[in-house]
Amino acid sequence: MVMKSSVEEEEGGWGLGIPEKMRNNANWVDVTQEFKGACKELKLGELLHDKLFGLFEAMSAIEMMDPKMDAGMIGNQVNRKVLNFDQAVKDEAIRVKDLSIPELIGIMDTCFCCLITWLEGHSLAQTVFTCLYVHNPDLIQDPALKAFALGILKICDIAREKVNKAAVFEEEDFQAMTYGFKMANNVTDLRVTGMLKDVEDELQRKVKSTRSRQGEQRDPEVELDHQQCLALFSRVKFTRLLLSALISFTKKETSAVSEAQKLMSQAADLLPAVHATIQYGIQSQNDTTKGDHPIMMGFEPLVNQRLLPPTFPRYAKIIKREEMVNYFSKLIERIKSVCEVINITNLHSILDFFCEFSEQSPCVLSRSLLQTTFLIDNKKVFGTHLMQDMIKDALRCFVSPPVLSSKCSLNNNHQAKDYIDSFVTHCTRPFCSLIQIHGHNRARQRDKLGHILEEFATLQDEAEKVDAALHGLLMKLEPQRQHLACLGTWILYHNLRIMIQYLLSGFELELYSMHEYYYIYWYLSEFLYAWLMSTLSRADSSQMAEERILEEQLKVRSSKKSKKKKKARPLSKEITMSQAYQNMCAGMYKTMIALDMDRKVRKPQFELDSEQVRYEHRFAPFNSVVTPPPVHYIQFKEMSDLKKYNPPPRSADLYMAASKHFQQAKLLLENVTSPDAEVNRILKVAKPNIVVMKLLAGGHKKETKALPEFDFSAHKYFPIVKIL
């Protein structure tokens, strides 16, 4: 039987045959002759088409045992014997004791590189577990290597647990499968950190004993020994600090997050020493049989090849040691940034923090740590605050609804309390989902934002009904007060933010063609930002009205005249930023229309679709939203038709109008007190665009056939227009 011979070959080369249990339970039948007989019934070139085997199955089918298609067959192509840990120890191919310091440094650095490659989306079997030492650390007799191997396993285990718990990864981000390997679960976290500390203390003594005394003649050998001990000490301490920081994130107290931040700062201080001593470690020899996977003592890239499913061979390119320190440096900065979230108490500020953090395109581990720090196992924010309380605080800050004011008669009304409590409870899940969405990678975020609009549309409907019910109750108790569109305004604000983010992220992900820019920028400037401005103004007015009522109540109680102080409006900066964004979008819309008039926008020859099909596809997720109502293509064409103006504007007029919009955005942003990085980024686009638009309005390069260039390097949503 063909299968039998391949099994024997496999057992000889790999020691991984069919498990005994499977052999005993299965009733193996040889179908070779029966299959060949059935094949004879087919004519030459004829294929059997089963209804369960369609085009999709054909495209994803794997021809097993073909080296080009089956990852498990790569092992048969190498001309060396692939050994597992036990075999390698038995054959003395690797040592478990009496390792030199350069060997330890080389093994540790390669292990760090494998750890990073795993965090970047490759499988454990092709990265960390290519290091034979982590297969069974109990057999290692060298204390430094044993403690390090256990430390790496614990780091992997906690990272895997955190990423799984946060659930903000997709198949392209992370592979959590452990392939049956033990993750040092027989040893406690405390024991491993203790072992690393013991090794660290021993190495520190060696570092001190080999240190040069002042004015002493230095022996080159002693100096080299000192540098090597220091290099090993830095790596062991770094492993302990990284592990201790991850352990801190598993605790429920917020003080543990502050502790993790301190540990990360200490770890960052060790990185220069690690980087400076990379050359002291033994260097890997490139695997000449397959790419450039590092082959060195203790590592076998093909040891787990048969554990991989029969898929197209995926080669894991292990990062270089020089890049390792840079990656760890950025990871530490991201984790330190994650720790800052516990200092934020306002829900809107937390949402902004998640958005800003996500814009850096952070790794899956730091994204997951942020999620699990925000919402701990007990479903409380930072383990202490109820999400419902945070939503109520956000409502008070944004729109000051009378029902949440302690000085309002509704505050003691049981029916009103039931209305608002029920509404806030219904808000909890969509807002938790919205925060979780910002933990996904940027491409997946966009897709999920489109889907969550449906939940917010339902909330919008409920908010309007609750507002109406509360207004009815309030009119009976306090006729001078209103409760119109308070909750509705707040939900509408979040609805608009999601819609704006959905459209803008398309520029970042490079989803739009140049000929589509004009209707995307039109929708943003004329519609979404116009609605957002109106919503923010309404929220600001609502706040002011509530403040006036409270001031009048205080005047009645106190006969003293209070000094009037000009109070800073909480929403003023957001209103200014929204105006600036609206002007930038309007400027880009008019620029695109003018460029199209001058025949400087390349348009496709539509065959299977049309502009209407593309337009409807781009705005399809907005169809589930009632407020604001979606603008359909025919409406858009009517609203943006230039022929309704008399006389219709020429391209020069539109360039000049675009220049004025960019100028207005510049003026608004230059008046922002303490401008942040985003303000400066927009100014970098607005200033050159003002100049370019004025040049184009004056007829500059009008006759040139060259198409304009859109440079998104300064800002990911608004390009600098370049005329070549």
Swiss-Prot record:
One of its GO terms (cellular component) is NatC complex. Keywords: Cytoplasm, Developmental protein. It is found in: Cytoplasm. It holds the Pfam family Mak10. GO terms for biological process: blood vessel morphogenesis; negative regulation of apoptotic process; positive regulation of cell population proliferation; regulation of TOR signaling; smooth muscle cell proliferation; somitogenesis. Component of the N-terminal acetyltransferase C (NatC) complex. Auxillary component of the N-terminal acetyltransferase C (NatC) complex which catalyzes acetylation of N-terminal methionine residues. N-terminal acetylation protects proteins from ubiquitination and degradation by the N-end rule pathway. Regulates cell proliferation during embryonic development. Belongs to the MAK10 family. This is N-alpha-acetyltransferase 35, NatC auxiliary subunit.
